[in-house]
Regions:
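Short, hydrophobic beta-strand segments
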Residues: 84-92
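Terminal connector regions
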Residues: 94-123
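N-terminal edge beta-strand
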Residues: 19-38
Length: 125
């Protein structure tokens, strides 16, 4: 009886591990190019749930207050696409080239993914 229970528990564990969401981004960086500091930059990262369970984005956040990421609130079905909207407000920041990470946390097998925004901010004239 113990063997049967152990075998059943092992099979159920393996099945739960195999059934997971997987997040795959179309691109992992977004280049805003050259822009003036007074112009807020906006963009989006498109991703697909390539797993077989619904994908839930728990958090998406930048490394500083100048970067805002807005993930979808609803779960993403297997095979469906979703979008994380991002904005960068460089007002009052240092001019020049930058590369800012955005950390995405989800229930996917790859539960933490980093995507990046980059650009070259110029001072206003």
């Amino acid at each position: 009886m113990k063997r049967l229970f152990s075998l059943l528990a092992a099979v159920m564990f393996c099945a739960s591990v195999m059934a997971q969401a997987v997040i795959k981004f179309e691109k992992t960086s977004l280049d805003f190019g050259k822009f003036r500091e007074s112009k807020v930059q906006v963009g989006e990262f498109v991703f697909t749930n390539t797993g077989n369970k619904p994908l839930v984005i728990q958090q998406a956040f930048g490394s500083c207050g100048c970067t805002v990421a807005t993930p979808p609130k609803a779960p993403i079905a297997p095979g469906a696409k979703g979008v994380i909207k991002v904005s960068y407000n460089g007002k009052g920041k240092f001019q020049g080239e930058f590369k800012k990470p955005i950390t995405v946390r989800s229930n996917a097998s790859n539960s933490i993914v980093r995507i990046y925004i980059l650009g070259n901010m110029l001072l206003d004239e």
